[in-house]
């Protein structure tokens, strides 16, 4: 089995998880982030189109987990957890 990716959560994403999202959504997003996302980030999400091509997006109901993958350092940086209507603005 391959080694898991290291997790980095941006200050914005941390604030969204702890203060802005409904508790049930924040819990589900966090479980996803520390589980399947760190196991295989390329498989659980899709690469975004320009100008956001350095990011990936994974669906969690009507919310999106937006993240960057650094394959060299095996690091996933979560940059946001937002409702899909606001995710790509």
Predicted regions located by residue number:
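Short hydrophobic/aromatic beta-strand micro-patches
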Residues: 68
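Residues forming the ATP-binding cleft of Hanks-type serine/threonine protein kinase domains
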Residues: 82
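Basic, Lys/Arg-enriched alpha-helical interface segments
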Residues: 1-59, 71-77, 85-89
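Glycine-rich phosphate-binding loop
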Residues: 62
């Amino acid at each position: 089995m391959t080694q898991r990716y290291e997790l980095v959560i941006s200050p914005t994403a941390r604030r969204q998880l702890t203060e802005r999202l409904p508790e049930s959504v924040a819990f589900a997003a966090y479980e996803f982030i520390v589980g399947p996302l760190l196991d295989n980030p390329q498989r659980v999400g899709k690469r975004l189109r320009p100008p956001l091509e350095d990011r990936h997006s994974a669906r969690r109901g009507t919310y999106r987990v937006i993240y960057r993958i650094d394959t060299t350092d095996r690091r996933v940086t979560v940059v946001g957890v937002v409702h899909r209507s606001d995710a790509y603005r």
